[in-house]
Swiss-Prot record:
The gene is rlmN. Binds 1 [4Fe-4S] cluster. The cluster is coordinated with 3 cysteines and an exchangeable S-adenosyl-L-methionine. Reaction proceeds by a ping-pong mechanism involving intermediate methylation of a conserved cysteine residue. Specifically methylates position 2 of adenine 2503 in 23S rRNA and position 2 of adenine 37 in tRNAs. m2A2503 modification seems to play a crucial role in the proofreading step occurring at the peptidyl transferase center and thus would serve to optimize ribosomal fidelity. This is Dual-specificity RNA methyltransferase RlmN. Disulfide bonds join 126-363. HAMAP family: RNA_methyltr_RlmN. Keywords: 4Fe-4S, Cytoplasm, Disulfide bond, Iron, Iron-sulfur, Metal-binding, Methyltransferase, rRNA processing, S-adenosyl-L-methionine, Transferase, tRNA processing. Its cofactor is [4Fe-4S] cluster. Pfam families: Radical_SAM, RlmN_N. The keyword 4Fe-4S applies.
Length: 392
């Protein structure tokens, strides 16, 4: 068998090494409703039992079959023998002055990061899809950690379950329940579709977390073939990590652009929009503002021209620094000038408020604890380049 020749191909080829069963028991968090119903049918039970169990798991965040009082004792005993509800554990919690909470979540012998962001009218959970990331975007902390593996369904939906359980226990303190989930944490979701899609199905299932498809957002840096596949698998809100209006700049800061350039990426986005109701006809464009790299007035005009055939809402993101990064954050005046140009073209343009940067929980700062399998960190050491080491 030929070996993957790029980091992204390597990531796509790696399946989770976490076993499906622990101690001979299947983790029910790995199953969407269709799979859960088949599980109960195989046990000789009626498929509606799946709906009952899912409701206990996701509506009430129960992980003990004995608490499921509308299930008879015989079935509860059978479930204890063959199944479990095992979400990843929190290794550490950090709280920001602005109310943001970041959790280091243990997955096997490594850690990913999950962030809860409360606002006046919503509470968003930022969820990771991989241990590390293979795409090597230069302005992103996660990319500097290298890549190890894809997360399983249970490790993705388990982040939501764990956060919902914690937030539920904090209701007396006024914490808003999770209303939105964004797949914008560690990793490239489109390189882990086989696990990300079932997890998003559970997020939107009435017997799961019951979120509207407009409140579940997947963000991608531009894996175009997988984006086409996504459109045939599920309908969720789409955000794209564009970050540059021209290929010469994007080739440097988002290296996957060398394989799928801006024109190809946006064509894929338009194909997705024709299949999607969740997006209401337009995509959210994420654009990190890097001082004197991608933030000139000329580049604002270029971005507007670039997006003229792709209905878009644009989020301008002040860059969030991390140790060893070669960039600076654009000044407020440069960001304001950039936004003004885009609005003059008629684009809805928002300058995203930085949240959680005092605990390294802001956009682009998530790092976790990753055992790199791409040799990226080894190459940096050999070249004498700085390596960001995070202790969580």
């Amino acid at each position: 068998m030929s070996q993957p020749n790029t980091a992204a191909q390597f990531a796509a080829s790696v399946v989770s090494e976490t076993p499906e069963k622990k101690g001979g028991k299947i983790n029910l968090l790995d199953l969407n409703r269709k799979q859960m119903r088949q599980f109960f049918i195989d046990m000789g039970e009626k498929p509606f039992r799946a709906d009952q169990v899912m409701k206990w798991i996701y509506h009430y965040c129960y992980d003990d079959f004995e608490q499921m009082t509308d299930i008879n004792k015989i079935l509860r005993a059978k479930l204890q023998q063959v199944a479990e509800i095992r979400a990843p554990e929190v290794a550490e919690e950090q709280r920001s002055a602005d109310g943001t909470i970041k959790w280091a979540i243990t997955v096997g012998d490594q850690q990913v990061e999950t962030v809860y962001i409360p606002e006046d009218d919503r509470a968003t959970l930022c969820v990771s899809s991989q241990v590390g990331c293979a795409l090597e975007c230069k302005f992103c902390s996660t990319a500097q950690q290298g890549f190890n593996r894809n997360l399983r369904v249970s490790e993705i939906i388990g982040q939501v379950w764990r956060a919902a359980k914690i937030i539920g226990s904090l209701k007396s303190s006024g914490r808003r329940p999770i209303t939105n989930v964004v797949m914008m944490g560690m990793g490239e979701p489109l390189l882990n579709l086989n696990n990300v899609v079932p997890a998003m199905e559970i997020m939107m299932d009435d017997f799961g977390f019951g979120l509207s498809k407009r409140r579940v957002t997947l963000s991608t840096s531009g894996v175009v073939p997988a984006l086409d596949k996504l459109g045939d698998m599920i309908d969720v809100a789409l955000a794209i990590s564009l970050h540059a209006p021209t290929d010469d700049v994007r080739d440097d800061i988002v290296p996957i652009n060398r394989k799928y350039n801006i024109e190809q990426f946006l064509a894929g986005v338009r194909r997705y929009l024709t299949k999607s109701n969740a997006n209401q006809g337009r995509v959210t464009v994420e654009y990190v503002m890097l001082d004197h790299i991608n933030d000139s007035v000329e580049q604002a005009h270029q971005l507007a021209e670039c997006l003229k055939e792709t209905p878009s809402k644009i989020n301008l993101i002040p860059w969030n620094p991390f140790p060893g990064a070669p960039y600076g954050r654009s000044s407020n005046s440069r960001i304001d000038r950039f936004a003004k140009v885009l609005m003059e073209y008629g684009f809805t343009t928002i300058v995203r408020k930085t949240r959680g940067d005092d605990i390294d929980a802001a956009c682009g700062q998530l790092a976790g604890d990753v055992i790199d399998r791409t040799k990226r960190t080894l190459k940096k050491r050999q070249a004498g380049e700085p390596i960001q080491i995070r202790s969580v």
